Regions:
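A short beta-strand-to-loop motif within the catalytic HATPase_c
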Residues: 86-90
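Acidic ATP/Mg2+-coordinating residue in the GHKL
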Residues: 40
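Short conserved segment of the HATPase_c
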Residues: 45-56
Length: 101
C-alpha cells in the first residue's frame, strides 16, 4: 500500500509541475482489482512524451528529475498482474491510470 501512496503523491506533484490547478485522484476497488486514476487540467503531454513516458530515465524536465516515477508505476502495476496507461491532450491535461490486480 505504500507504493500506492507514493504513486498518488508523485502523480499529483507531476500535475502541479505541469501547471494544473485541478487534480482529480480516484481509487476504485472491484473485487481484487484496484484502479488508480489521476487526472489533471495541466499543460498536457506531447505525443512523443506519452509514447516514452514509461521508458526508464526519460524526462522532459531539465532539473532534479530522474525519469523513474512513471516506470516505477508501471513496474508496480505489472508486478501484480495489472497495467498502466496515459491519455493526454496537449493544452488540456493528462490522465494516468493504473490497474493493480
Amino acid at each position: 500500500m505504500t507504493d500506492i501512496a507514493f504513486h498518488i503523491t508523485d502523480l499529483a506533484a507531476n500535475s502541479l509541475r505541469a501547471g494544473a490547478d485541478a487534480i482529480d485522484i480516484a481509487l476504485s476497488l472491484d473485487g481484487t482489482q484496484l484502479e488508480l486514476a489521476v487526472t489533471d487540467n495541466g499543460c498536457g503531454m506531447a505525443p512523443e512524451a506519452v509514447r516514452r513516458a514509461f521508458d526508464p530515465f526519460y524526462t522532459t524536465r531539465t532539473t532534479r528529475r530522474t525519469g523513474l516515477g512513471l516506470p516505477f508505476l508501471l513496474q508496480s502495476a505489472e508486478g501484480c498482474g495489472g497495467s498502466a496507461a496515459i491519455r493526454s491532450v496537449p493544452g488540456k491535461g493528462t490522465c494516468v491510470r493504473a490497474l493493480f490486480m
